[in-house]
Amino acid sequence: MSQVAKKLLVTCALPYANGPIHLGHMLEHIQADIWVRFQRMRGKEVHFICADDAHGTPIMLKAQQMGIAPEEMIATVNQEHHQDFTGFSVSYDNYHSTHSEENQTLSTKIYLELKKNGHIKNRTISQLYDPEKNMFLPDRFVKGSCPKCKAEDQYGDNCEVCGSTYSPTELINPRSAVSGATPEMRETEHFFFDLPAFSDMLQAWTRSGALQEQVANKMQEWFESGLQQWDITRDAPYFGFEIPDAPGKYFYVWLDAPIGYMGSFQNLCDKRGNLNFDEFWAKDSTADLYHFIGKDIVYFHSLFWPAMLEGSGYRKPTNVFVHGYVTVNGAKMSKSRGTFIKASTYLDHLDADCLRYYYAAKLSARIDDIDLNLEDFVQRVNSDIVNKVVNLASRNAGFINKRFNGKLADKLADPALYQQFIDGAKVIAEEFNNREFSKAIREIMALADLANRYVDEQAPWVVAKEEGRDADLQAICSMGINLFRVLMTFLKPVLPSLAERAEAFLNTELTWHGIEQPLLDHQVSAFKALFNRIDMDKVDAMVVASKESINTPQKVSGPLAEDPIQDTITFDDFAKVDMRVALIKQADFVEGSDKLLKLMLDLGGETRQVFSGIRSSYPDPKALEGRLTIMVANLAPRKMRFGISEGMVMAAGPGGKDIFLLSPDSGAQPGMQVK
């Protein structure tokens, strides 16, 4: 009896519905999509779903600021998010919203089951209240210093520096993030999920292989510090689902948000009619459930979520796959620098496959951060996709189309080399399955190098000029095209749009099992350009378009207004200036000048004479003697009527009596270069 193939349900974390998708979000959705596409190519039944996280105070307040209903705002955002993911070829079977009938039904059901099973506790608490806005403040709307590590400007539920969780009342120097007012303490009744009751189950589950080792180790710290009951209540006004039999009380967004996975799948089941919800979510489900998430929401997905499922009679996730953050050019994404790039802005300038490839080339199964270095991005895409892969097709297709009417040879020119490519499929498949995408890409590019070396050695452009060698030419070029086909099959999960164009050229579908049989005596289509090289100008234009536009520029005051920053120079221009630490050995008035002082500067073995216009600020020049300063040492000597000035000392200030000679920190020595 044959074994029944596993069925997979895969999710990404739900984007919050109060803003656009950016390239940080896209890392996760691309990672998951590559994995899903690979599983589908291997014959697995995969259902891939997501939704917008559409509840909470931030959405309520933003809608108020916009003068529209929250429902209207989240509907618009949902459409935009769906459009962005489609533009990046993310192959969701369903993209829904947590503000849905399915999600409300499931949230209510799970809450009532938890309550029936004794896992919901209610008690009166003291909570922070904004006296200006007349509202209780949810934890994300209180800021202050972390009670554990003392980091400033942290939210009221968890610290982004040390990862600790706590209640808003534990914050040091709390303030309302809504109005800035100092909050007051008021009493209110709240409902709590009894998370500590699931401690033993959670400790076993986290060590079962459901989490990466890095994550499981971090969770052990949380277990050792003790789990706390989880407040699942928010007071009106609040945009979300009202708790049954508790007027004016609402489910905290983090209760119904993960249930949104279930709600989106229920919506898909209702649409298709041939999917069974319980087959994937029931306690005895044999299907696999995978969540792709960022490391910032591990606490919710590895503690609250599995405990909620366990306590309400549902199955737990098979695996939670955690990834790191995205930086751009080695730094946090910045609107002012133009590196906070929206998905839609990227798509206005560049091909989605480019980013998919670059992320894949850097992703592993670890939770390390990924840096999107824009110069490296251009170089790698052009080098790998254009020069190594697409060029392999173009340099052979011309001969096949022109000389042989698009017909490939009836036998392989180098069966051993082709078999080497086929043998590589096993390792590449293992790397894709294990989410070690960067390793898979390295294996694929190593094969691409072999393919191009074969073509270089066979030199079809030379063979084409030799009489009587048509059969050799056809065989060589057919071999190159067959190797291109194998490479594109391996890359199909990563580059779906390019793969589609390659399939049109090859006149065949790219399937994992299909590469066992090469294309022999096969008709290919006329070759059309498959992929465009990235122009750095397009990347620069994308960055410019991403810079935050300020409709009403802030009025600049102070020194910057009086002396604006000059035009940008290159690093090479700056590097030409040689600044050195100098010791003022002697300082004197200059006879005949009421502005200049004559300074004798020791550069640690060389003495320079410099005339400087700082007399008005230093009426006693002898007070400068023995002091260290900074001078431009490679400035061309300037002949003055008082003598030759052999450099320039550095000073700040607008002039007159407001001139301030610059000095290095203690420890600097004469002659040291300033870099």
Curated annotation (Swiss-Prot):
GO cellular component, one term: cytosol
Family matches, as InterPro entries: aa-tRNA-synth_I_CS (IPR001412), Anticodon_Met (IPR041872), Met-tRNA-synth_bsu_C (IPR004495), Met-tRNA_ligase_1 (IPR023458), Met-tRNA_synth (IPR014758), Methionyl/Leucyl_tRNA_Synth (IPR015413), MetRS_core (IPR033911), MetRS_Zn (IPR029038)
Enzyme class, spelled out: ligase
Catalytic reaction(s) noted: tRNA(Met) + L-methionine + ATP = L-methionyl-tRNA(Met) + AMP + diphosphate
Motif range ('HIGH' region): 15-25
Domain of life, per lineage: Bacteria
GO MF entry, a single one: methionine-tRNA ligase activity
Residues bound to Zn(2+): C146, C149, C159, C162
E.C. numbers: 6.1.1.10
Location of this chain's protein in the cell: Cytoplasm
Cofactor(s) needed: Zn(2+)
Pfam family, one: Anticodon_3
Keyword Oxidoreductase belongs to the record: no
SUPFAM superfamilies: Anticodon-binding domain of a subclass of class I aminoacyl-tRNA synthetases (SSF47323), Methionyl-tRNA synthetase (MetRS), Zn-domain (SSF57770), Nucleic acid-binding proteins (SSF50249), Nucleotidylyl transferase (SSF52374)
Coarse class of the protein's main subcellular location: cytoplasm
Chain ranges of the tRNA-binding domain: 573-675
GO terms for biological process, alphabetical: methionyl-tRNA aminoacylation
Summary of subunit composition and partner proteins: Homodimer.
Family affiliation: Belongs to the class-I aminoacyl-tRNA synthetase family. MetG type 1 subfamily.
Described function: Is required not only for elongation of protein synthesis but also for the initiation of all mRNA translation through initiator tRNA(fMet) aminoacylation.
Name of the protein in its database record: Methionine--tRNA ligase
Lineage: Bacteria, Pseudomonadati, Pseudomonadota, Gammaproteobacteria, Enterobacterales
